[in-house]
Amino acid sequence: MSNDKIINAYPDIRLMYLSLIGMVLCVSLTAQQTLSLGRNNYNQDKGIIFQKESGVNARIYTNGFSFGYQLGKIKKYNLSQYYFAEFGELKDPIESRQQKNISLSGPRGTFRGFIFGKQNNFYPLRVGVGEKRFLSEKGKRKGLAVGVSYEGGPTLGLLKPYYLILRHTSDNPGNFTSIRSERYSDENAPRFLNWDDIFGADKLTKGLDELGIVPGINIKGSLHFDWGAYGEFIRSAEIGLMADAFIRDVPILADNDILGINNNQNIFLNFFVNLRLGKRK
């Protein structure tokens, strides 16, 4: 090949190289922009990484239950940080529901079961922040990922008076008997804590206009099992230990030395199981 032909071929070769470099740059810029937007961020080893996740929780613990919501940000493929809020009921460990087979003609009919000695229902509203770390990896879309979760924050405890339907016997001749709905007090303690005078519990909404407040804090730690750790949909379960601490004793049961009821406390420890469903995006 002559020198003239070789020299004349250089522009074509340079043009090919420039075109190839331009194509590579375009693909690189497009990929970088796509990753920066958090889309198609797929790693062969770590799975699909999203930016945010949200879900609902159903938690059962030793002495109560709660329902909640989580909203979080995915920091890394194995690390998420989130905010949470949950509302439920916290019971005294020695509570026992009882039932009397009593029925009356009229609007009341059969009476509801009751908890002997109960003074208040206690409903904690827990909020706070948490973190979830995965300790194991799984296949791209299948398998089980195991991790740990820990969270904590303030608690607003709501006390609702517990009402019983009590029997009142008149001192007049004929011993006329009436029934009344009453909450616990020092004055009616002998009747409130007398099995024979109790017909049953009043409706659950009774006392909602008499709520009291007990502030506190909450912390939880758990093992986390996720069947969709790197997928779009969240299906996970947790088992762990939770603690609630309040600024004063919570009067769930009526203190009574005669009956041996002196169990009110300000710190509650519970084992729990939590189920969570949600979505990542």
Task: State each model region's role.
Residues 56-58, 69, 83-87, 127, ...:
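Membrane-embedded beta-strand positions of outer-membrane beta-barrel proteins
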Residues 46-52, 74-81, 92, 119-120, ...:
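Short loop/turn motifs that connect adjacent beta-strands in outer-membrane beta-barrel proteins
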Residues 1-47, 281:
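Cleavable N-terminal export/targeting peptides
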Residues 50-54, 61-65, 79-81, 121-125, ...:
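Residues that define the transmembrane beta-barrel architecture of outer-membrane proteins
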Residues 32-87:
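Short glycine/proline- and aromatic-enriched beta-strand/turn motifs that initiate or cap beta-hairpins
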Residues 60-64, 73, 87-93, 131-135, ...:
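Transmembrane beta-strands of outer-membrane beta-barrel pores
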Residues 86-126, 130-141:
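Outer-membrane beta-barrel translocator/channel fold
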Residues 151-238, 242-264, 277, 281:
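Outer-membrane beta-barrel transmembrane domain signature
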